């Protein structure tokens, strides 16, 4: 699991069936100071997060289990909106 800031959204018309009805967001992984730590990624949103919000992102089986779809094409999922963080 890692913390990230949502920087954008992804619009798609043709997709793998398991992505139907899912909202994909562009997330920028950040450290405890809110500084960027690596390249942006795409994650499937499970909590209704919006651009500019800090979120927690899960990967792999943990991400797929959020949607109860163990065989889906989902690799990363936004699982929480961060209210605050401090170091």
Question: Could you tell me what each predicted segment is?
Answer:
Residues 1-35:
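N-terminal first-folded block
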Residues 56-87:
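C-terminal structural segments of small proteins and small subunits
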Residues 30, 44-46, 60, 82:
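A structural micro-motif recognizing beta-strand termini
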Residues 14, 38, 63-67:
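A short, acidic/glycine-rich surface segment
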Residues 39-43:
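Short alpha-helix capping/helix-loop boundary micro-motifs
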């Amino acid at each position: 699991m890692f913390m990230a800031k949502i920087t954008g959204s992804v619009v798609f018309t043709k997709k793998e069936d398991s992505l139907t009805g899912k909202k994909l967001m562009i997330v920028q992984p950040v450290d405890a100071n809110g500084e960027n730590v690596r390249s942006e990624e795409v994650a499937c949103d499970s909590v209704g997060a919006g651009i500019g919000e800090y979120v927690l992102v899960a990967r792999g089986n943990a991400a797929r289990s959020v949607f109860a779809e163990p065989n889906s094409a989902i690799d990363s999922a936004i699982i929480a909106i961060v209210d605050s963080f401090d170091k």
